[in-house]
């Protein structure tokens, strides 16, 4: 079956009486060149374990299976599971998993390949080096941001994520301070990953065609996160609160999560070279980390 042929894809969907759901972001990639560019960006190797979220018809899954050790293809829609059994069910290294990617316990999922040590928040290799654990997906648009943040927060030791996302989402991932797209997701991802846009994807390479353009982004895990593990949960809370209202100053946004007075917070900022009236979107990621560490060390967190 030629999954790069819109006509054959249409026939396949009709055979299973499936009408793609916009609510699930079901626009299927039908361009082999784009598939190969995604695989090249991920630098897939035969030792790699790949998480693929939203495999759809299995187009990317099938091509990746020739390059890697194992694939965990996680699909929410039971109708797609039936198709995947036909298109990639015969691939020995593809595990089709019917589950919600936003609720799945990823550490449990890959425990057969990696032994986790919660006390050290690290992982010890069983069968593979953690550097060989990657996520490669044409993500359903509606889950892109929450999924990537979930993987970061839960410390799933992914060395690389290569993801196709809506262009608007990619712009938020890679935004610069002061821009309209710069927000909490930008800051948090940059703390854990080096984020780059790889290439744009036109809507014409999908069936059915979406209304928006896409972009493939690459997130490479930093050798050391910008915030120590012990403080990451509080830092995430801090950053989210800093962008709670873009029209408010940083001090006014974060006041509710600290026990200190507003004047004390303002004074701390000014003593360290920052304006008391600065807003979250004006700060670089490194400045966010710097301010958090200063305030955290001087005022008890509520």
Curated annotation (Swiss-Prot):
GO cellular component terms, A-Z: cytosol
InterPro entries: KsgA/Erm (IPR001737), rRNA_Ade_diMease-like_C (IPR023165), rRNA_Ade_Mease_Trfase_CS (IPR020596), rRNA_Ade_methylase_Trfase_N (IPR020598), rRNA_adenine_dimethylase (IPR011530), SAM-dependent_MTases_sf (IPR029063)
PANTHER family: DIMETHYLADENOSINE TRANSFERASE, DIMETHYLADENOSINE TRANSFERASE-RELATED
Domain of life, source organism: Bacteria
Pfam families in UniProt: RrnaAD
Binding site for S-adenosyl-L-methionine: 27, 29, 54, 75, 100, 138
Keywords: Cytoplasm, Methyltransferase, RNA-binding, rRNA processing, S-adenosyl-L-methionine, Transferase
The reaction(s) this protein catalyses: adenosine(1518)/adenosine(1519) in 16S rRNA + 4 S-adenosyl-L-methionine = N(6)-dimethyladenosine(1518)/N(6)-dimethyladenosine(1519) in 16S rRNA + 4 S-adenosyl-L-homocysteine + 4 H(+)
MF term (GO), any: RNA binding
EC number: 2.1.1.182
Family that this chain belongs to: Belongs to the class I-like SAM-binding methyltransferase superfamily. rRNA adenine N(6)-methyltransferase family. RsmA subfamily.
Record flagged with keyword Signal: no
Entry's localization field: Cytoplasm
Protein name: Ribosomal RNA small subunit methyltransferase A
Root EC class: transferase
Protein purpose: Specifically dimethylates two adjacent adenosines (A1518 and A1519) in the loop of a conserved hairpin near the 3'-end of 16S rRNA in the 30S particle. May play a critical role in biogenesis of 30S subunits.
Signal peptide positions (record): none
Main subcellular location: cytoplasm
